[in-house]
């Protein structure tokens, strides 16, 4: 867990069927998960993408 991360359970690292949030091979089941990842890792690299896709 990254120091300062307030939601360690929020991130999904395994491939999943993401409904709306995805980037490369990492998907998020919700916007919360995506925002938590971005905050914990100090990046805004992961953005919202349209459509559904298994990644």
Curated annotation (Swiss-Prot):
Is Disulfide bond among this UniProt entry's keywords? yes
What does the record say about tissue specificity?
Stored in hemocyte granules and secreted into the hemolymph.
User: Can you say where in the cell this protein is located?
Assistant: Secreted
Keyword list (alphabetical) reads: Antibiotic, Antimicrobial, Disulfide bond, Immunity, Innate immunity, Secreted
What is the disulfide pattern of this chain?
A: 5-40, 7-36, 10-32, 17-54
Q: What Gene Ontology biological process does one annotation of this record name?
A: innate immune response
User: Would I find Disulfide bond among this entry's keywords?
Assistant: yes
The principal localisation class reads secreted
What's an example GO cellular component term for this entry? extracellular region
Question: What is this protein for, i.e. what is its function?
Answer: Has antibacterial activity against Gram-positive bacterium M.luteus.
The record's note on quaternary structure and interaction partners says: Monomer.
Protein name as catalogued: Locustin
Species: Locusta migratoria
């Amino acid at each position: 867990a990254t120091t300062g991360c307030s939601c360690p359970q929020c991130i999904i690292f395994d491939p999943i069927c993401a409904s709306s949030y995805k980037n490369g091979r990492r998907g998020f089941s919700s916007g919360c998960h995506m925002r938590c990842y971005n905050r914990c890792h100090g990046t805004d690299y992961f953005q919202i993408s349209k459509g559904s896709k298994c990644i």
